[in-house]
From Swiss-Prot:
Biased composition (Basic and acidic residues): 1029-1054, 1061-1073
Name under which the protein is recorded: C5a peptidase
Phylogenetic placement of the source organism: Bacteria, Bacillati, Bacillota, Bacilli, Lactobacillales
InterPro entries: C5a/SBT2-like_Fn3 (IPR010435), C5a_Peptidase (IPR034216), Ig-like_fold (IPR013783), LPXTG_anchor (IPR019931), PA_dom_sf (IPR046450), PA_domain (IPR003137), Peptidase_S8/S53_dom (IPR000209), Peptidase_S8/S53_dom_sf (IPR036852)
Disordered: annotated span: 33-73, 1029-1116
Gene name of the record: scpA
Main location (coarse class): secreted
């Protein structure tokens, strides 16, 4: 026999161990930093977000969760944080050609006008709370330090002493204070993010900078308080840390605090009291806290559209959800400062186009280029040697396109968009290869241009953007989990140039970049108001500044949809510092609480009442109207785009001097309700803006957003329906097997974390070999030598007789799943535990079990906080949560095993929205501990090696599997395989087994065991040698919990079949969805090789599946690196398992 190649298990184990050690080391370095461009339920600090680095081909089978139109191929920039850790891209040192600032060239928010009136922040202190900073950057500079609030370190120390602050260092005249509130004593790996954010707020680069234009923040002459905070000991501790930073910033004199980080979808109500008090303290002192809305788009993340049946798809979390904060969304203006390239067109005209480059091309050099299709095949690159490869976006990852071009001899890559009006995308750095991204329009021009040369210019210019004015697709939508209106306002956040570590500058994108601009504007506006309204208290000036800034914002209009972007996406609109500075009027709700109107639930007809405030000495005449709109629906999904319904007519109003007046606008959307309810059966938003002009033909003067919900928002379903109830076998995050819709595979050692996400009950499948070992006294499961493992599966699912790799839902005649357990302590289907995909945040989740009379026999502990499963991504959160506290092991309140019978397992929970009522979901669970009755004797034919049992097994539950197991030594591991019955019920026993190396092992009769399991998980195993002796099994030889000759004296109500145990019929197993009985496979007789894992001796340390180690409600602080370690670990185990499976399956088919 040919010697088979030995599988490198030892090498894999070494690689696995090394990987684990390295990842643990990296975990120690990075601590718990989770950035908002990698959205997380436990995320910490938001990093540049929407610069996608790879592309994926949409699955042709994806029917439930199509990709968003703007994100057709790329895996959104959830890898931006990883890119920050890669080798930096080469940048050409450009001598200073001008002392002009970036804002001199492009100022979409019109900050310069406000700076001229309020100064540039001299004498003011601003604070930035973030994950890390380069505290010695060249941009941290004061033009005139004699105007600074803190003239010296001694001044700072005096202020610290007054407020009992014993920590924090003076860095220089600009950075008056720096402290690490994380208390981990480590240097932040990510210094980019906080440095970039601080530069937008208060950067002040010197004229000697190597950049062509000088960075100047919104408040360049303000002093900085840099406060490092990141997750170290959990979210609650993290929130307390940034609360302490807020208090210190206020006490040290900060006028504004920027917080560009967040925890997606978390509710303000769940923050620690210390954090809420810190927000209130800042407000009382007139200190503005500005937060980023987040980069998590909406429910489903950036690659899925939310379902039209579930309108609560907002993901703005904390701290942005706090009412006292000013929460900022991101948009792209119609013009941008950008790198450029020039081409000579067919008519000999010079055409400039914007480019976003990674590893810049040599400036002012003419490059030849050649078209290379989508850069997938070798033939695409036949003409690119020594030239730039022009490649269309799509089909494969950007990095693969670049690598392919480099391999073909290209000197650079130009990738053009495959969709119109798309956003620029930062390409990955592949071996320092020059690469740049351009628009589709410019790419097609290059493709058709007869002169195939291009020149990259040294100096950036302001050019129109391909997208036009547009909300960033990554910017998080409201409402908040509490049901409040957020975000408040929008600012540019796409490709923003600012400072990064080591005296460098770079473009980053994200709401992180939008917030500090607004923070600077707020600081300047409050400075203006100190002079303009000296009699006001600081808190009154803060309140006025926030209302004026929101009122003067310009509502952004979607030219494609001919409607305004939703207030749940843009807030009040794009910030306009010039309008805010000049404003003498503003608009609020009728109670003068804020400059937004939350109507909560509305009917088809309702009214919007607002208050117009006039702070001038003259009466003001205005015209007003309201826009009415809702969500656009595409098929079964929200399109994340607005749908205009109608606009009211313009009306006239006069507001007396130094006074206010209310305006009421009647809305009637009844003519749209039939069509809208057909598209959104659970209700829909009716929203828009009440807009004011001094003349109907002139530009908008001010506006206020309003939001109402036509339906019952508070009582929308919080939980996705169970997967058992799905007609096509799919859920939002789960794509059904088209050939077997009821297939729900267990976890095993395969990493199904991104796959098994739906609402269901879980349980465990425990093989008889492990049950036997435990019964024989092995206390530590790691000491059990077996090729089989304990596996987490879904209640009501069963494998086939000869294939343990797939599980299928088995149903009763009424269609409900056959969820049955046998809580006898053997670890096999002993319990059920709840797993849910939550569509909304909820509170007070509890599981309880009711008997057939409706009496509660058991109640779980309460899970107080449940966060919606807004994404299915290892970098953020999974598409379902397993609740450890809901595990029911078949016992009552007193810890006694309940009687056999059918019970209702109920999960209760309440949405956290105002006015919500408790909801619940029920599952039927059968409990049955009845001992199996099996044959006590058998005969064996030596001629054909057939084993014939004296009788068929009997039980109160259908038989799941009846098999002959045999165990042999393969190297140092006992390996178990199974034999399925022949059509006549006999078993053909093999004479030998084959090892992984191809060696044969003779089998003795003592190697064989008869194993029977029913659908409740009761297992009995008997050595074949005992069957052949014709003797009844003794208790110590029998695998069941009781001796076969000592049947329990069951009362009628204790029998799961509804009959008394002494009158049990020969139960015929029910059939599963495939039309066959689970475990029964016709025309078998050959050995059915176990598909459990060859290397599970090493893997058994995990006991349960890898999936159960993922974050649960009791383990909410597991972060991205911990998930990465788990992925790597289970990947290696899965690889070994796959090799073993493949080998065994091939042998079985021989």
């Amino acid at each position: 026999m040919r010697k088979k190649q030995k599988l490198p298990f030892d090498k894999l184990a070494i690689a696995l161990m090394s990987t684990s050690i390295l990842l643990n080391a990296q975990s120690d370095i990075k601590a718990n930093t989770v950035t908002e461009d990698t959205p997380a339920a436990e995320q910490a600090v938001e990093t540049p977000q929407p610069t996608a680095v790879s592309e994926e081909v949409p699955s042709s089978k994806e029917t439930k969760t199509p990709q968003t139109p703007d994100n057709a191929e790329e895996t959104v920039a959830d890898k931006a944080n990883d890119l920050a850790l890669q080798a930096p891209a080469k940048t050409a040192d450009t001598p200073a050609t001008s002392k002009a600032t970036i804002r001199d060239l492009n100022d979409p928010s019109q900050v310069k006008t406000l700076q001229e009136k309020a100064g540039k922040g001299a004498g003011t202190v601003v604070a930035v709370i973030d994950a890390g900073f380069d505290k010695n950057h060249e941009a941290w500079r004061l033009t005139d330090k004699t105007k600074a609030r803190y003239q010296s370190k001694e001044d700072l120390e005096k202020a610290k002493k007054e407020h009992g602050i014993t920590y924090g260092e003076w860095v220089n005249d600009k950075v008056a204070y720096y402290h690490d509130y994380s208390k981990d004593g480590k240097t932040a790996v990510d210094q980019e993010h906080g440095t970039h954010v601080s530069g937008i707020l208060s950067g002040n680069a010197p004229s000697e900078t190597k950049e062509p234009y000088r960075l100047e923040g919104a408040m360049p002459e303000a002093q900085l308080l840099l406060m490092r905070v990141e997750i170290v000991n959990g979210l609650a501790d993290y929130a307390r840390n940034y609360a302490q930073a807020i208090r210190d910033a206020v006490n040290l004199g900060a006028k504004v605090i920027n917080m560009s980080f967040g925890n997606a979808a978390l509710a303000y109500a769940n923050l620690p009291d210390e954090t809420k008090k810190a927000f209130d303290y800042a407000k009382s002192k007139g200190v503005s806290i500005v937060t980023s809305a987040g980069n998590d788009s909406s429910f489903g993340g950036k690659t899925r559209l939310p379902l039209a049946d579930h309108p609560d798809y907002g993901v703005v979390g904390t701290p942005a959800a706090a009412d006292s904060t000013l929460t900022v969304a991101s948009y792209s203006p119609d013009k941008q400062l950008t790198e450029t390239a020039t081409v000579k067109t067919a008519d000999q005209q010079d055409k400039e186009m914007p480019v976003l480059s990674t590893n810049r091309f040599e400036p002012n050099k003419a490059y030849d280029y050649a078209y290379a299709n989508r850069g997938m095949k070798e033939d695409d690159f036949k003409d690119v040697k020594g030239k730039i490869a022009l490649i269309e976006r799509g089909d494969i990852d950007f990095k693969d396109k670049i690598a392919n071009a480099k391999k073909a001899g290209a000197v650079g890559v130009l990738i053009y968009d495959n969709q119109d009006k798309g956003f620029p995308i930062e390409l990955p750095n592949v071996d320092q290869m020059p690469a740049a991204f351009i628009s589709r329009k410019d790419g097609l021009l290059l493709k058709e241009n007869p002169q195939k040369t291009i020149t990259f210019n040294a100096t950036p210019k302001v050019l129109p953007t391909a997208s036009g004015t547009k909300l960033s697709r990554f910017s998080s939508w409201g409402l908040t989990a509490d049901g409040n209106i957020k975000p408040d306002i929008a600012a540019p956040g796409q490709d923003i140039l600012s400072s990064v570590a080591n005296n460098k500058y770079a473009k980053l994108s994200g709401t992180s970049m939008s917030a500090p601009l607004v923070a600077g504007i707020m600081g300047l506006l409050q400075k203006q108001y100190e002079i303009q309204y000296p009699d006001m208290t600081p808190s009154e000036r803060l309140d006025l500044a926030k209302k004026v800034l929101m009122s003067s914002a310009t509502a952004l209009y979607d030219e494609d949809e001919k409607a305004y972007f939703s207030p749940r996406q843009q807030g009040a609109g794009a910030v306009d510092a010039k309008k805010a500075s000049a404003a003498t009027m503003y608009v609020t709700d009728k109670d003068n609480t804020s400059s937004k109107v939350h109507l909560n639930n509305v009917s088809d007809k309702f009214e919007v009442t607002v208050t117009v405030h006039n702070k001038s000495d003259k009466p003001q005449e205005l015209y007003y109207q309201a826009t009415v709109q809702t969500d656009k629906v595409d098929g079964k999904h929200f399109a994340l785009a607005p749908k205009a319904l109608y606009e009211t007519s313009w009306q006239k109003i006069t507001i007396p001097a130094n006074s206010s007046k209310q305006v009421t606008v009647p809305i009637d959307a009844s003519r749209f309700s039939k069509d809208l309810l057909a598209q959104m059966k659970n209700g829909y938003f009716l929203e828009g803006f009440v807009r004011f002009k001094q003349d109907p033909k002139k530009e908008e003067l001010m506006s206020i957003p309003y939001i109402g919900f036509r339906g019952d928002f508070g009582n929308l379903s919080a939980l996705e329906k169970p997967i058992y109830d799905s007609k096509d076998g799919s859920s939002y995050y789960h794509e059904a097997n088209s050939d077997a819709k009821d297939q729900l595979d267990g976890d095993g050692l395969q990493f199904y974390a991104l796959k098994n996400n739906f609402t269901a009950l879980t349980t465990e499948s425990n093989p008889w070999t492990i049950i036997k070992a435990v019964k024989e006294g092995v206390e530590n499961i790691e000491d059990i030598e077996s090729s089989e493992i304990t596996e987490t599966i879904f209640a009501g699912t069963f494998a086939k007789q000869d294939d343990d790799s797939h599980y299928y839902i088995h149903r009763h005649a009424n269609g409900k799943p056959y969820a049955a357990i046998s809580p006898n302590g053997d670890g096999n289907r002993d319990y059920v535990q709840f797993q849910g995909t939550f569509l909304r945040n909820a509170k007070n989740l509890v599981a309880e079990v009711l008997d057939k009379e409706g009496n509660v026999v058991w109640t779980s502990e309460v899970t107080e906080q449940v966060v919606k499963n807004y994404n299915n991504d290892l970098a953020s959160t999974l598409g379902s949560t397993r609740f450890e506290k809901t595990r029911w092991d078949g016992k009552d309140k007193d810890g006694k095993v309940v009687a056999n019978g059918t019970y209702t397992y109920r999960v209760r929970y309440t949405p956290i929205s105002s006015g919500a009522k408790e909801q619940h979901t029920d599952f039927d669970v059968i409990v049955d501990n009845t001992t199996l009755e099996v044959a006590t004797s058998a005969t064996f034919s030596t001629e054909d090696r057939r084993l014939t049992l004296a009788s068929k097994p009997k039980t109160s539950q259908p038989i799941y599997r009846e098999r002959i197991a045999y165990t042999y030594m393969d190297e140092d591991l006992p390996t178990t395989e199974y034999i399925s019955p022949n059509e006549d019920g006999t078993f053909t026993l093999p004479e030998e087994a084959e090892t992984m190396e191809g060696a044969t092992v003779p089998l003795k009769m003592s190697d064989f065991t008869y194993v029977v399991e029913d659908m409740a998980g009761n297992i009995t195993y008997t050595p074949v040698t005992k069957l052949l002796e014709g003797h009844s099994n003794k208790p110590e030889q029998d695998g069941s919990d009781q001796a076969p000759d000592k049947k329990p004296e069951a009362k009628p109500e204790q029998d799961g079949s509804g009959q008394t145990p002494d009158k049990k019929p020969e139960t015929k197993p029910e059939k599963d969805s495939s039309g066959q009985t689970p475990g029964k496979t016709p025309q078998k007789g050959q050995p059915s090789r176990t598909l459990e894992k060859r290397s599970s001796k090493r893997a058994l340390a995990t006991k349960a599946s890898a999936r159960d180690q993922l974050p649960t409600t009791n383990d909410k602080d597991t972060n991205r690196l911990h998930l990465l370690k788990l992925v790597m670990t289970t990947f290696f185990f899965g690889l070994v398992a796959h090799i073993f499976k493949t080998k065994r399956q091939k042998e079985t088919k021989k």
